[in-house]
Amino acid sequence: MGGPWMGSVGAGWGVSYIMFYGIIGTGAIGGYYGAKLARAGKDVHFLLHSDYEQVAANGLQVDSVAGSFTLPAVNAYRRAADMPPCDVVFVGLKTVNQHLLPTLLPPLLKPDTLVVLIQNGVGVEAAVQQMFPHVQLAAGLAFICVAKNRPGVVEHLDKGSIDIGNYSCRDAARMAHLMADLADAGIEAREVEYHEARWRKAVWNMPFNGLSVALRATTDALLADEASHGLVRALMLEVIGAARALGVEALTPELADRMIAYTLAMKPYSPSMKLDFDYHRPMEIEFLYTRPIALARQAGFDMPRLSMLEAQLRFEEGRTLKTP
């Protein structure tokens, strides 16, 4: 419920210090991680849009393969201006809505706030750092199958871990406290080198998001067919090659086979870009394709297959995007 906030916040970074968490973009991913933290007793504040009334009145429900639960009352807000300053802010907005951050983020900021961008793509933090030069940023790379198809209800289908990559956080204690809180909430979380974290997720995202739209297929269908299975692997190797050209040597060609095995073990899933396409919403082409392809090209590495897929996605978006 929105309104005044309370909490016993200690003066130091000891055990008694209770961090305030803000969730900007309480969709499927932000809703899931925020709800898990709130269930563990953390002080979490949710910015909502279309389902504010539902959540403010009835709380937040998580239907999960790992155990469903309901939070009957949460700190729900319709306006960022009504939210308290937070120690950690999770941004779960789609990157097509980055232009909203200069309005949404400032009310939640303190001088030492850590902003974790749980968003798809490469180059996300650099773009946000230009908007907020002095804000501490980290990348949040969620490996999870989750959807939000009903107001106030998050459907958790599979997986659920998150990698955190430090982009510009100067406060080691803040980062350590975040990792401890995630663990306390039952969230499998690792702190990973920033560039490795972003490009590792891109190895999965760039093939599956785009191909799910271009071929109108879920993850299981893409891997069940010999031709599309081979294409998925070829695209993964192209992403790995780009990452290595940019100095991310921790990503090796063997990662493609591990990612495919990981996906085969998942429940059939429509990636977020496919859902955006189905609902005639803007797709996250810029940060998922355009920017990483441009970065690779600057390093002397071309991504011809993914450049073609990017062009197909631009064409599809132009045809299907709803007009005002």
Predicted regions and their residues:
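Internal alpha-helical scaffold of NAD(P)-dependent oxidoreductase catalytic cores
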Residues: 107-108, 130-136, 151-207, 213-251
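NAD(P)-dependent Rossmann-like dehydrogenase/reductase catalytic/cofactor-binding core
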Residues: 16, 183, 233-324
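Rossmann-like NAD(P)(H) cofactor-binding subdomain of soluble oxidoreductases
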Residues: 68-153
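Short, well-ordered alpha-helices that flank and scaffold nucleotide-derived cofactor binding pockets
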Residues: 35, 39, 103-107, 130, ...
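Short alpha-helical
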Residues: 50-54, 96-97, 122-123, 197
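NAD(P)+-binding Rossmann beta1-loop-alpha1 motif at the extreme N-terminus of oxidoreductases
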Residues: 14-71
